[in-house]
């Protein structure tokens, strides 16, 4: 497992992919898979089964992981 310079709550800029150039905050860091989840970037529509929190089910917009090499830390 590698130690990363990017932590939860850091401001990062996406440097590759559809959201290239966006600056946003890191929601979650996943060191085992070398990925991060960035707020508002790589949003996908996921289907959700009915549950107590969402009785009807349906579709939810959810941020998907981005490889850590595709983001760079930005000084706030």
UniProtKB/Swiss-Prot annotation:
CDD domains from the xrefs? KOW_RPL26
Source organism's superkingdom?
Answer: Bacteria
What keywords does the record list, in alphabetical order? Ribonucleoprotein, Ribosomal protein, RNA-binding, rRNA-binding
Stretches that traverse the bilayer:
none
Name the SMART domains on file: KOW
Q: Which Gene3D superfamilies match?
A: 2.30.30.30
In terms of InterPro entries, this protein maps to: KOW, Rib_uL2_dom2, Ribosomal_uL24, Ribosomal_uL24_CS, Ribosomal_uL24_KOW, Translation_prot_SH3-like_sf
* BP term (GO), one: translation
Q: Name one GO molecular function term.
A: structural constituent of ribosome
Q: Name one GO cellular component term.
A: ribonucleoprotein complex
Query: Quick check: keyword Ion transport in the entry?
Result: no
Q: What does this protein do?
A: One of two assembly initiator proteins, it binds directly to the 5'-end of the 23S rRNA, where it nucleates assembly of the 50S subunit.
List the PANTHER family hit by this protein, alphabetically: MITOCHONDRIAL RIBOSOMAL PROTEIN L24
Q: How does it assemble?
A: Part of the 50S ribosomal subunit.
Family, per entry: Belongs to the universal ribosomal protein uL24 family.
HAMAP family for the chain:
Ribosomal_uL24_B (MF_01326_B)
Q: What is this protein called?
A: Large ribosomal subunit protein uL24
Instruction: Provide the species name.
Output: Wolinella succinogenes (strain ATCC 29543 / DSM 1740 / CCUG 13145 / JCM 31913 / LMG 7466 / NCTC 11488 / FDC 602W) (Vibrio succinogenes)
Q: Tell me what gene encodes this.
A: rplX
């Amino acid at each position: 497992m590698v130690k990363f310079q990017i932590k939860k709550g850091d401001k990062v800029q996406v440097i590759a992919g559809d959201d290239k150039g966006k600056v946003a905050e890191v929601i979650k860091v996943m060191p085992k898979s070398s990925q991060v989840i960035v707020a508002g970037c790589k949003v996908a529509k996921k289907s959700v089964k009915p549950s107590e929190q969402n009785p009807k089910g349906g579709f939810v917009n959810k941020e998907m992981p981005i490889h850590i090499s595709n983001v760079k830390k930005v000084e706030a």
